[in-house]
Amino acid sequence: MNFILSEMTFLRYYMPLIIEAKNRGIRSRVFVGRNNKYNNPRAFVDYIGDLSRVHKFEILDLDEAHKYAGIVFLVEGVEHNKVDNSKTRIVSLTYMTDYSGLYDSYVNKVDHIVLPSKSFAKAYNKNSPKNLYLGSPKYDVELNEEEILRKYDLSGSKKALVIAPRSRDLGNAKLAQIYKTLNSHGLEVLVKTRGKDPLAKSLHGDKYFTDPSWYPHTTMELIHISDIVVNFSSTAIKECVMLRTPLINFHIKPFEKPLKFLYEYDYCENFGKEFSENQLQNAINRLTNQDLGDTFNISIEKHLFTGSSSKRILDYLELY
């Protein structure tokens, strides 16, 4: 099998498929490209090499991709023109909600498009016979709390993960107040941002993270070990639901929140830019003390998926 890696963020989707393929005796090739962003694979060749040695996949230059036949995985149609579609079967994986704007540009250039569920296609009216509702391989990763705590040198105390807003929205986020309130509940404040959206040191909370780990991805690891998440309408809502971590969401984006259907459950408290200290205190109390297992189950069953997506995807491709 072949994988087009033009952004490091794609690894979290590819690695579970590569591992599942290896378990079936199928070798994989990863074609490494480049970009001018913080997630340029060329800046992480040693990291990719380490993964290759552990998981036994071959690394080649993206310019070599057109020489190879078989199944090709890519993300959101990116670099589809680098492969020879006369001898390949192109499978495009969707990336969070990027497909809402990109889908139409590649739907006629690929053979299959893997979406988490029909809810995701319906939400943005992206329907095609090419759609495969098989989940997302990104979540086929075993996360161990003790290993994550050791990896990031964290204590076993209760934790709140703040997924920082984009720089564009930072002026509407009352981060200092939120941190103070979380700390008052005995919660260690972990702050996660993207490499392209750094925060001032005064907003680093108790521990500050960018993207030290591409696979497993840092955000998923931190959600897994946290008791509650503070979100600003990022698509990390999907990770919170899949990992069953309750969240407080502050909608400060200048447009409608993506995947809004996932916010309409009791595992989430929704606020706008303005909120009172009492409201925030009550939200933290409820979410950290209430059993939310049933509401997570309902949301996952209705909108998402269970089980191994990697197995479903490879089963489908082997069958057809």
Specify the residue positions occupied by each region the protein language model found.
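Catalytic donor nucleotide-activated moiety binding site of glycosyltransferases and closely related
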Residues: 29-51, 163-168, 180-215, 263
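Donor nucleotide-activated moiety binding/catalytic core segment of transferases
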Residues: 59-65, 195-243, 247, 254
